[in-house]
């Protein structure tokens, strides 16, 4: 899928920089953030973000708290949780809170790209359904 824009959130700057380079080579636009608070700020300032890649353990605002805020304020944005020191159960808990999926660190870039594309497609499908419902509602009001 082309024209995918993601927000990559992790407090490990070298990790973010390495992943950004790899994702950009694959045509994915990447906006970096280094904690949950910065992620929320980026979502408010950057339109068109399809997917958030969100680390769980971060300073200022951890990933689980950020996930709750993101899904509350930006319900259509899909979130993929990253678990390093956390457990699989933490990743599953994130999915119960609304995350699209999770990945265990270290993970394969190809696996991440597949999940990002699937999540972006789901977001765009949801946006399309909402638009169709709005058009239908307007059409019904006119008749």
Which residues does each PLM region occupy?
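Short amphipathic alpha-helix used as the core "switch/output" element in two-component signaling
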Residues: 41, 64-76
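Charged docking surfaces used in two-component/phosphorelay signaling
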Residues: 17-25
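Receiver (REC) domain active-site loop signature in two-component systems and cognate sites
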Residues: 58
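CheY-like receiver
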Residues: 122-143
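Helix N-cap/capping motif at the beta->alpha junctions
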Residues: 32-41, 63
